[in-house]
Amino acid sequence: MATERSLTPDQIVAYHRDGYLNLPGFFAADELAPIQAALADDPSVGGRIATVHDGSEKTRHDYLGWTRHGDDWLGVATRLARIVEGAAVLIGEPVYHYHSKLVKKPAGRSGQVVWHQDYGGWYQDGCLMPDMLTCVVALTPATEESGCLHMLKGSHKMGRVDRIRDMDAYANINPKRLVGMLARFEDVAIAMQPGDGLFFHGNVVHRSGDNRAGYDRMLLEFSYNGVGNAPVLGNQDHHAAKPMKVVPDDALSNGDFLGVIGSTPLNDLSDPADEGYTIYVRDGFPDLS
């Protein structure tokens, strides 16, 4: 299924130069209305939203996660041609859905996420190459006040940076190295309005701040991997390359989905026994079997 909204040559160049690509108005208001209404009606999604803490028990944010996709709004959005084809062009090979998250920073909550690389965690999953990226879609305004993303522009060119602890996906970067990174790379705040999109490389160093605003900051984060880069380590069946039926760009606006949050299996990211637990937390190094 080909997209009618292909990335331009200039956009592709910008992504590889900077490590990210802003896409204003990537989703229309009517496309987002169903998921926004569902979250307003049931903010905890039936109690399935979990909370992430850092090592000091400072609350970060609330989230849902999924690795498989159904035919509800969440599952269809995951498979939209404009996202999947864009990811494939930027990665340089066909892609599959790795995992996705709804990330919410409640109003007024301390919810910062420290500087990190996503591929630092995905490498622990067993992905040998950084041929991975995330597509972010804003559901509410993301500003400096509400805790928007920050990118170190061009930092993906460093390659994978060693982590100084291995207990979760946001393990710290060595502080001395981080000082050098902040001196070398421009710190860019990524302000987003509802519907704006963002592709960013698995190796770009990024963070987000506390939400000091009077509303919840909510983002959808769809992550994709090259089909030839599936994890080689054990206990990663949920991250294996899976067939994905790509849907037309107008699927959401045409209402071609069955419910909003329903048939897409949501992972219990607070339960270490759940297959999708490693979307966020990794207990040291994964099983080498």
Predicted regions and their residues:
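A short beta-loop-beta micro-motif enriched in histidine and acidic residues
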Residues: 83, 121-132, 185-186, 192, ...
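Non-heme Fe(II)-dependent double-stranded beta-helix
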Residues: 1-18, 23-126, 164, 235, ...
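Double-stranded beta-helix
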Residues: 13, 142-205, 209
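Generic beta-strand structural signal
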Residues: 93-100, 111-113, 131-137, 147, ...
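Active-site glycine-rich loop that binds ribose-phosphate moieties when present
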Residues: 114-123, 137, 176, 183
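Short edge-strand/loop segments of extracellular domains
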Residues: 105-106, 152-159, 223-229
